[in-house]
Amino acid sequence: MIHYVCKYTPIELFAGFGETCAVLEEMPENFEMSDQIAHANLCGFGKSVIQAVLQGKADELVMVNCCDSMRRVYDIVASTGKCKFLYMLDLPHDDNECEKEKFAAAIRRLKEAYEKYSGKTFDKAAFFHSFAKLRTETKPYIGVLGVRVSGVLEDMIRENIRMDVDNLTCTGGRRLTVTPEELEKMDEDAMFLAYADGLLGQMPCFRMNQSSRRTALYLDPNLKGIIYH
C-alpha cells in the first residue's frame, strides 16, 4: 500500500505496478512520538504524518512539496529511515505549457524511482484501466474547504447535515479530465504530458498562482453551503 497526502499525486501511475494507493489521513490521539523529533509549531497534519510513519502505518509514502510543512515533514521522515520507499514530488505553481512539461518529467522520475525500488515493470494497460470515470450526475452538496479533512470527519458532516458532502481540501476533490481512451492513442512522451495536464487541470489549490478557476465553485448551483475547516 502506497500512501499519499496530496490530490496532485499521480496515484494511477502506481496501478501500473500493481499497487494500490490510499490517502494518509491518520487521526492520532496524541503527538507523543512526533513531538520528540519535530518542532512544536509544526502543523497538526504534518505531525500526524510523522506519527503514522513512526508507528509503522506508512512504509511507502509519496509526498508533494506543496507547503513548507510538507518539506519539513519529508526531511524528518527521511531521517527516521522508517519508510522503505519515500519520495518527494515537485509540484509546479502554474499550469502553463512549460510547467506541464516539467511536471510530466517529474512524474517520469517518480516512475523510474519506483521501478528501481520495486524491481517491477510498468504495465501501461493496468495504468489505463485505473482511471476513475468522471461523475456526470449532479445533485445538491455541501463543500468542505480549508485544511485537510479526514474521511471520519467527512462522514460525520454528511450524517449530521443529511446532504452529500464534497471534500474540496488538499486530499479531496480529485477529478482528472483526461481519459484512458485518449492516453492509449499516444506515445509515451505525449501520454505523460497529457497525464500531467490532467493532474494540473484540477480545481487549483492555494499553492497555485492562477487560482481564479476556484470561482467556479461558488457559481455551481448545486453548492448549497460551505464548511470551512
Whereabouts are the PLM-identified features?
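An N-terminal assembly and electron-transfer interface module characteristic of large anaerobic redox
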Residues: 1-229
